[in-house]
Amino acid sequence: MASEQTIDGAAAIPSGGGDEPFLGLLDVALLAVLIGGAAFYFLRSRKKEEEPTRSYSIQPTTVCTTSASDNSFIKKLKASGRSLVVFYGSQTGTGEEFAGRLAKEGIRYRLKGMVADPEECDMEELLQLKDIDNSLAVFCLATYGEGDPTDNAMEFYEWITSGDVDLSGLNYAVFGLGNKTYEHYNKVAIYVDKRLEELGANRVFELGLGDDDANIEDDFITWKDRFWPAVCDHFGIEGGGEEVLIRQYRLLEQPDVQPDRIYTGEIARLHSIQNQRPPFDAKNPFLAPIKVNRELHKGGGRSCMHIELSIEGSKMRYDAGDHVAMFPVNDKSLVEKLGQLCNADLDTVFSLINTDTDSSKKHPFPCPTTYRTALTHYLEITAIPRTHILKELAEYCTDEKEKELLRSMASISPEGKEKYQSWIQDACRNIVHILEDIKSCRPPIDHVCELLPRLQPRYYSISSSAKLHPTDVHVTAVLVEYKTPTGRINKGVATTYLKNKQPQGSEEVKVPVFIRKSQFRLPTKPETPIIMVGPGTGLAPFRGFIQERQFLRDEGKTVGESILYFGCRKRSEDYIYESELEEWVKKGTLNLKAAFSRDQGKKVYVQHLLEQDADLIWNVIGENKGHFYICGDAKNMAVDVRNILVKILSTKGNMSEADAVQYIKKMEAQKRYSADVWS
């Protein structure tokens, strides 16, 4: 994007009082030259670049994220002869990926498709979709947070919830993306599927539910491979044709692009790294200097970092309980290895261009750029590849046995699924590992870049209070590193990146960040008592809570009791923020309950301490209407804690188990029960 330039054209007013012309002849001449020069520059900059002859691939589907000025998906469908539109609600990219795969497969069934972001479309046009022959709307919708729609599906969700439109004649299907460890499993997809039927729409195929805690990829391919026959039967279409390799983007190598026009890691705006300007968000992150990066663990072989980021001058604001998102970069050695395996010159400047000229999503990531930049900043190279990637990689195998192995793992056969589970998932193989082990598979690097998902920001609970640290954000992060069954050492992308970001003297070390607001909040009345359950790094948001309550006490305000249940392995190894916690206890701000699971013969966890303190917990949440918070592991700890709370409410509150469950749901509705958990 060329920077805008302005010319100060204010003329000096003559000091005399006569009726002289506002602009003299010389002024007019100079102005004409300036205007002419500006017009020449503008027209020249708008000229299309000449494209080298190296470009290839075809694509019958489009990713259509229409602009605000052209948000009619109906017009696009009609203009391009399409009848299938796949909407997605996605927070991390998986929903969008599934939508793209469905639209791409539609060509096999004579249904030309496009992918659409509901946030960028006029969703009231769903009423008109029935006017297109054999039309079908598919919704791939993730449930996010506390049973909420994703950011980009929020307006559609509100519209379908509050509206009372007649959707008779609309053919639809829904696939949901959720996680069974969370209470509101696939709530959004379940509701939308039911609501569309209530509004008169025709369900072409049953609701599909994907569980990210198990194998969402298997859930999706099992659903879609039953979905397509149902669609064919509904529309009277013959079965699918032969599967062919279809490329969505064509390669354009651009060796002559000026260096200042090449993306070097910017998320959206070119030169946004060098020229920072607010507001800062997911598309325009702030480069935050790291002020402190220190180790919290005292021993034990594991690492936990305390990081302090400066947000001074960013105009970003946060509250205790919010999240900070960081954009990591991939390990240089992995990037180099992938380049070698694909026989690529990583410093080649290129663009991947959508073959559908009607699509407003011209590139899968910022282009033009280099392969090195794309693999470092834009693509997820350490993730476990999904089956559709294996299917396309198989076409580049020269060894038939290796080709068959990849094809088998991409199939829906029981043997193929079992092989995918053991060889890919259990072995934690990423794209680099696969190409290392499948030695005859050497795909072109541009196709690899097309196939890999976008590198997503990593979210961390902020472990500080803006009352005490208004221009700093604190982060508490455990370094992820483990040995796989193949003997390789896998490392977490973000924590490895952060571990190496050590401030050195006067030289600033920066990371791109933005703030994400949360519903995880302290009570509006400081005198309200609270219970916090946060083992390990689950302590992070509660450190911010306690800082804030200490700050209020120091100001002379009345603050309710703050009870923290914290757990770790050993007091001598991973008791993080020990001195701070002990100091708050001494000052009377904190009532600390600590469980050290491996400091005695029988393991003790926070769950055990909660059971022992049944009277205290009932007093806080039952008799004094206090707030209850959980932060940490969703799959085990959070479930156990909730079950214990149900038991305490039943015994101490004289409730049935069903009433106790309803009591917790009522607390959730009142924002008195909050969870910040992950799996």
From Swiss-Prot:
Described function: This enzyme is required for electron transfer from NADP to cytochrome p450 in microsomes. It can also provide electron transfer to heme oxygenase and cytochrome b5. May function to clear the olfactory organ (antennae) from accumulating chemicals.
Essential cofactor(s): FAD; FMN
Gene Ontology MF terms in the entry: flavin adenine dinucleotide binding; FMN binding; NADP binding; NADPH-hemoprotein reductase activity
EC number(s) recorded for this UniProt protein: 1.6.2.4
Flavodoxin-like domain boundaries: 84-228
Cofactor details (free text): Binds 1 FAD per monomer.
Binding site for FMN: 90-95, 142-145, 177-186, 212
Source species taxonomy: Eukaryota, Metazoa, Ecdysozoa, Arthropoda, Hexapoda
GO CC field: cytosol; endomembrane system; endoplasmic reticulum membrane; mitochondrial outer membrane
Gene3D superfamilies hit by this protein: 3.40.50.360, NADPH-cytochrome p450 Reductase, Chain A, domain 3, Nucleotide-binding domain of ferredoxin-NADP reductase (FNR) module, Translation factors
Biological-process GO terms, alphabetical: cuticle hydrocarbon biosynthetic process; nitric oxide biosynthetic process; response to hormone
Residues the entry annotates as binding FAD: 458-461, 476-478, 482, 492-495, 678
Binding positions for NADP(+) per the UniProt entry: 302, 537, 597-598, 603-607, 640
Domain FAD-binding FR-type: 283-523
Residue intervals annotated with topology Cytoplasmic: 43-679
Membrane topology note: Single-pass membrane protein
Subcellular location: Endoplasmic reticulum membrane
UniProt entry tagged with the keyword DNA repair: no
Matching PANTHER family: NADPH--CYTOCHROME P450 REDUCTASE (PTHR19384:SF17), NITRIC OXIDE SYNTHASE-RELATED (PTHR19384)
Catalytic activity annotation: 2 oxidized [cytochrome P450] + NADPH = 2 reduced [cytochrome P450] + NADP(+) + H(+)
Family: Belongs to the NADPH--cytochrome P450 reductase family.
Segments in the Lumenal topological domain: 1-21
Tissue specificity: High in antennae.
Residues spanning the membrane: 22-42
Name the record gives this protein: NADPH--cytochrome P450 reductase
